[in-house]
Amino acid sequence: MDPLRRKQAEMLFSEYNRELAKVYDKILDDVKSEVDFAAPDFQSMLQNEVFNCLQPWFSKKLDGLSEDTPEGFFDSLITLDDTMEVFSIAAQMVDGDLPDLLMLRLGAFGEEASMRLLELAMAGEWIRGEGVEDNAFRDGILIHMAALRILGLWNIEMALDPVLARFLNIDAPDELVAESVRDFLVPYGEVVVPRLIACLDEGSEGGLVGPYEYLVIGLTEIGKENASEEIFQCLRRVFRSMEHKVIASVCLGDYGDGRAVPLLKGYLDRHTHDVDRQFFYETLSAIKRLGGDIADITDPFRDFSSKK
């Protein structure tokens, strides 16, 4: 890509960030109730509103662009090499979701684009090197993690096995890597469920620590939209095997199947004086979310003893 086009891309994404911030501010200023913020579909509504409000901006003249408008700039990307370079610039600069017109342009190259994205995702260093600061490490993998998330959004099935294999080889994944892998997995929905269940069953003897914790969270998110007996039974097994049971407890509460109440209450009853404060209260919250009664649960920390 020639230096002028690169400079124009950088300018475009700077302006995109400004417009994106204005759109978010306007939408959020119109939300007056905390109840609205807490609504289950709020994030989905927000994304749709942002998408709709941004559309006119792409067809407006932007000084400094040879093609006059952002839409014209993206349409002018003829080669995959140029489009990938613009994608890399966007991944480093854009504050929120990448522009849809850029994603459409990239998607127009079909399987070749998917292969390039997979190569880019796998080329990054997923483990922070010794002496490398967290921020420097994360800045260095922004492009690779953006490619990973796009592969998930596009449901590129050939990416699943290599990504899972690499992730599960990381003992203590960085938060950005872990969240990117989760964001990669969730859009696949029920397609990826058998793989996740198999991974969790295989990792159960090791206590399901590190990367497995994020697979549990991802499976739960998928299960909220694609509930199945297999997912519920897997989460039950995870609770019994998991070293950090607070994660499994929260996930059972989030998944929403009331059959988990006896499991959670039974565990609290048997381990009243063994559990820590965080686990106890997160599990109480999970039981309540599942419709269970907590009045008969002994409070080992006596925070509510006066009410009993």
Show where each model-derived region lies.
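N-terminal alpha-helical modules
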Residues: 1-94, 98-132, 144-146, 162-166
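Basic amphipathic recognition helices
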Residues: 40, 243-245
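Short, solvent-exposed linear motifs at loop/edge-of-secondary-structure regions
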Residues: 46-63, 140-141, 153-155, 254-258, ...
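Generic detector of short, well-ordered, non-transmembrane alpha-helical segments enriched
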Residues: 49-54, 143, 216, 244, ...
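Amphipathic alpha-helical scaffolding segments comprising HEAT/armadillo-like alpha-solenoid repeats
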Residues: 80-90, 111-133, 156-169, 190-203, ...
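Short coil turns that connect the paired helices of HEAT/ARM alpha-solenoid repeats
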Residues: 89-96, 123-130, 134-139, 168-176, ...
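Structural detector for internal amphipathic alpha-helices that build alpha-solenoid repeat scaffolds
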Residues: 99-112, 131-156, 165, 175-191, ...
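Eukaryotic acidic, Ser/Thr-rich intrinsically disordered low-complexity regions
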Residues: 265-308
